[in-house]
From Swiss-Prot:
E.C. number(s) listed in UniProt: 2.5.1.18
Classification via InterPro entries: Glutathione-S-Trfase_C-like, Glutathione-S-Trfase_C_sf, Glutathione_S-Trfase, Glutathione_S-Trfase_N, GST_alpha, GST_C, GST_superfamily, Thioredoxin-like_sf
Organism field: Cavia porcellus
GO terms assigned for molecular function: glutathione transferase activity
Name of the protein in question: Glutathione S-transferase A
Binding sites annotated in the UniProt record for glutathione: Y8, K44, Q53, V54, Q66, S67
Example of a GO biological process term: glutathione metabolic process
Stretches assigned to the GST N-terminal domain: 2-82
Positions of post-translational N-acetylserine modification: S1
Cellular-component GO terms for this entry: cytosol; extracellular exosome
Keyword Acetylation assigned: yes
């Protein structure tokens, strides 16, 4: 049924985790980037966006929307979603926690200038004292190379994506979390992920405030 087609802006945003997951699963995909208002209007007018918003992924004969639903479909299809309901619960719990931290990065971009420092301080505090210790503890108590079971899952891939984001924001935040550093290295060295991390891949830049302002006009 051909390659999946991803419809989104030329930034990370809510599509980047989908790009990571497809890449890790070894699935080649195409992108139709939304570069102007007309591109988005066409998708809407053609009735392709259920809720009039992106991301949207064309895959297996479907027009899929809502990023978490898309991620769950891909994870299920490519056996990255645990072996039973208990493992799926853990994967969901962990990825929802990642989303909570991920959302704080968007708040920094959207914060007015006088609130940016406070928003950055909040990320540092939450990363260092809440989220990263929780994931480090999971790896330590689980005693395996991965977060759930002894097998790569959606949770490991999305955590690796998040760790790159944290590192780019402030590398010192990862200093005390040796198991998270090891997980990041392990996942990054998987052949499909390694390829995705090379320059010239379909990875996207983290959005600047200017990019966000442009996208919000649409």
């Amino acid at each position: 049924s051909g390659k999946p087609v991803l419809h989104y802006f030329n930034v990370q945003g809510r599509m980047e985790s989908i790009r990571w997951l497809l890449a890790a699963a070894g699935v080649e995909f195409e992108e139709k980037l939304i570069m102007c208002q007309e591109d988005l209007d066409k998708l809407k007018n053609d009735g392709l966006l259920m809720f009039q918003q992106v991301p949207m992924v064309e895959m297996d004969g479907m027009k899929m929307v809502q990023s978490r639903a898309i991620l769950n479909y891909i994870a299920t299809k490519y056996n990255l979603y645990g072996k039973d309901t208990k493992e799926r619960l853990l994967i969901d719990m962990y990825t929802e926690g990642m989303t909570d931290l991920y959302e704080l990065f968007f708040k920094v971009i959207l914060a007015p200038p006088e609130e940016k420092d406070a928003a950055k301080s909040l990320i540092k505090d939450r990363a260092k004292n809440r989220f990263l210790p929780a994931f480090e503890k999971v790896l330590k108590s689980h005693g395996q190379g991965y977060l759930v079971g002894n097998k790569l899952s959606k949770a490991d891939i999305l955590l690796t994506e998040l760790l790159y984001m944290v590192e780019e924001f402030d590398a010192s935040l990862l200093a005390n979390f040796t198991l998270l550093q090891a997980l990041k290295t392990r996942v990054s060295n998987l052949p499909n992920v390694k390829k995705f991390l090379q320059p010239g891949s379909q990875r996207k830049p983290f959005p600047t405030q200017e990019m966000f302002e442009e996208m919000r006009k649409f």
